[in-house]
Design a protein with these regions (language model features):
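Active-site-proximal alpha-helical segments within enzyme catalytic domains
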Residues: 124-128, 177-183
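Short, conserved catalytic-motif segment at the N-terminal edge
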Residues: 4-65, 85-89, 102-109
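Short Gly/Pro-enriched turn/cap motifs at secondary-structure boundaries
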Residues: 21-22, 113-116, 147
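Residue-level signature of the cytosolic catalytic core of signaling kinases
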Residues: 3, 7, 118, 148-149, ...
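Active-site SXXK
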Residues: 11, 15, 38, 64-95, ...
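Cytochrome P450
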Residues: 170-176
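Active-site helix/loop module of the DD-peptidase/beta-lactamase fold
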Residues: 64, 80-133, 137, 161
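Short, charged, amphipathic alpha-helices and their helix-cap/turn boundaries
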Residues: 44, 95-96, 123-124, 138-167
Length: 183
């Protein structure tokens, strides 16, 4: 059931007011409301694209949602596990779907690299136990990647191929995922 014009207008006014004062409010936002039937009930943008920006927020503005993609990909993966399409603990399947995982090395404390002893599974990717990390969380990885100019946020696939921080399945580190849809 669509929103009546009065409710639609009232919601848009609330969104606009939230973005009026750039100092005490929010710079800009896009709000989309979808009914349980999947139909769009409201789509409205207000304010600017960021603090200090004069570019207006629009329904076509692109957002960097960073690690929120992990939640979306995790749900999608678990739906595929439920359907029997993916397996949580099959390293051969996971590395077959993401062949770049096969050649990853493990970064040792002395800065040298060693071969992986185990394959990487979907469960490891989803639970941050595959060995991936971020340079800003891990000094050893930062020291290794800095001289070669690797930047995990560049969008280049070669920069995503940083070494693992530990053998797959033998530790935990919040980090990038090889199944990251941004790459």
């Amino acid at each position: 059931m669509p929103l009546n014009e009065q409710v639609h207008s009232h919601l848009c006014d609330i969104i606009d007011k939230a973005c009026e004062d750039q100092k005490s409010g929010i710079p800009g936002t896009t709000v989309v409301v979808v009914g349980k039937d999947g139909n769009e009930l409201l789509a409205h943008s207000a304010g600017n694209r960021g603090a200090g920006s004069n570019d207006p927020m629009t329904l076509d503005s692109i957002f960097w949602i960073a690690s929120c993609t992990k939640m979306l990909v995790g749900v999608a993966c678990m739906q595929l596990v439920e359907q029997g399409v993916l397996k949580l603990d099959d390293a051969e399947q996971t590395e077959g779907l993401c062949p770049e995982l096969k050649s990853l090395k493990v970064l040792l404390p002395d800065g040298s690299l060693e071969e992986k002893k185990h394959g990487i599974t979907l469960r490891m990717l989803l639970t941050h136990t595959a060995g991936f990390g971020y340079t800003f969380f891990n000094e050893r990885l930062k020291q290794w990647s800095y001289p070669i100019g690797a930047d995990e946020f560049s969008g280049r696939i070669e920069d995503m191929k940083l070494p693992l921080l530990f053998q797959p399945g033998e530790g935990w580190q919040y980090g990038v995922s090889a199944i990251n849809p941004e790459s």
